[in-house]
Amino acid sequence: KMHREPFSVSLDFLMKLRHGGHQVIAVGTTSVRTLESLYYVGVGIIEEGEAKDVDQWAPYAREYDYSLEESLDAIIDYLKARGETSLRVGTRIIIVPGFRFRVVDVLVTNFHQPQSTLLLLISAFIGGEWKPIYEYALAHSFRFLSYGDSSLLFRAE
C-alpha cells in the first residue's frame, strides 16, 4: 500500500494552473503525484461535494470523463465558497504504466532504484524509453537516489 503524502496547494497556484496554457514542469516524483492527484480531488468535489484524499487506485477504478479544466474549476469554486486560500488533502496515488497524465508535461528527477514504485512512475511517464535511459545511466556510473544525477524527461504522447 502506498504511503499517504499530505499536500497543500494555494488557490493562486490553482488559478494559474487552470488558466496558464503552458507546459507544466514537475521537479521530483512527489510533485508529479501531487499535481496529478489534483484532477481526482476535483472529481471528488464534482461527484461528492467534498475535497478528500486520493486513493491509491482511484485513477484505475473507472473511466473519468471530466476535463482537467472542469476538475480545477471545481477545486477553485470549492475553496472560494469556503473562503479558503489553499487546498489541504493527501494522496496515496500510485502511478504505473497505463496511467493517464492530465497535468504534468515535463519531469526533472533523479534516477530511481530498479523495481521501485518510482521507476514505475518513470515508465508510465516516458513509456518504453525508460529502459535505454537507465541502461545508459548504469553503464556510465550515474549516481542514483536523492543526491545522485538527475534527468529531464518529457511525457510520452
Regions found by a protein language model. Name each.
Residues 1-157:
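Surface-exposed, charge/polar-rich loops and edge strands
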